[in-house]
From Swiss-Prot:
Membrane topology note: Single-pass membrane protein
Transmembrane segments: 3-23
Coiled coil feature spans: none
Top-level taxonomy: Eukaryota, Viridiplantae, Chlorophyta, Nephroselmidophyceae, Nephroselmidales
Keywords: Chloroplast, Membrane, Photosynthesis, Photosystem II, Plastid, Thylakoid, Transmembrane, Transmembrane helix
Organism this protein belongs to: Nephroselmis olivacea (Green alga)
Protein name: Photosystem II reaction center protein T
UniProt xrefs under HAMAP family: PSII_PsbT
Length: 31
């Protein structure tokens, strides 16, 4: 069960980082 928690933490952290970068600089891919 610990592996599942660590995996969830890792995915959530990467998601938050990606979210921050995505909103920090505007997406240039419009098409």
């Amino acid at each position: 069960m610990e592996a599942l928690v660590y995996t969830f933490l890792l995915i959530s952290t990467l998601g938050i980082i990606f979210f921050g970068i995505f909103f920090r600089e505007p997406p240039r891919i419009v098409k």
